[in-house]
């Protein structure tokens, strides 16, 4: 005789029907890190964008000042007198600074776009490989920019001294050529490049902090 607990009134299965097996619960998979909500605060991303924007502005200004820097002087050869014009390309250090400022400006613009997208959709720059890539590039850009600015600072010193900056066989400088404006604008572009480096270095520090805070 069946007990009450074994009767059909206490069973959830209809008499004659086999008990259905309950499927095992499948554990929910953890999404890959790229889709995890970033732990970096929104303020950190905004600060990085602002710093990159400042770097971009100062790099473009330094590039523009350097590109527009020219000087004219007269050269007498016998009875003939000719007017010569020099540009920033007269010294390789200035050409180097011009190229570096252009690269830093383009790089900063690209990273601003990337981080603005990241600010909207979140999660892209928090991927470990991307964060490492950005960190390495920030460090590289800061190093290259400070090396170019330092070399150009020495170029300004050479231009102001009694040194050959025009390619002629005799020593001529900004002072005795009457092109002091040339050296002044060159000094201004170098100073602006140093300011751009300052913001680039701070940006590199921010990217390093974001990298080390990733899980």
Swiss-Prot record:
GO terms for cellular component: plasma membrane. It is a multi-pass membrane protein. The chain crosses the membrane at residues 45-65, 94-114, 129-149, 186-206. InterPro entries: CASP/CASPL, CASP_dom. The keyword Cell membrane applies. Residues 1-44, 115-128, 207-215 are cytoplasmic. Glycans are attached at residue 164. Keywords: Cell membrane, Glycoprotein, Membrane, Transmembrane, Transmembrane helix. It is found in: Cell membrane. The keyword Membrane applies. Its main location: membrane. Pfam families: CASP_dom (PF04535). It comes from the Eukaryota. Residues 66-93, 150-185 are extracellular. NCBIfam families: A_tha_TIGR01569. This is CASP-like protein UU3. The lineage of its organism: Eukaryota, Viridiplantae, Streptophyta, Embryophyta, Bryophyta.
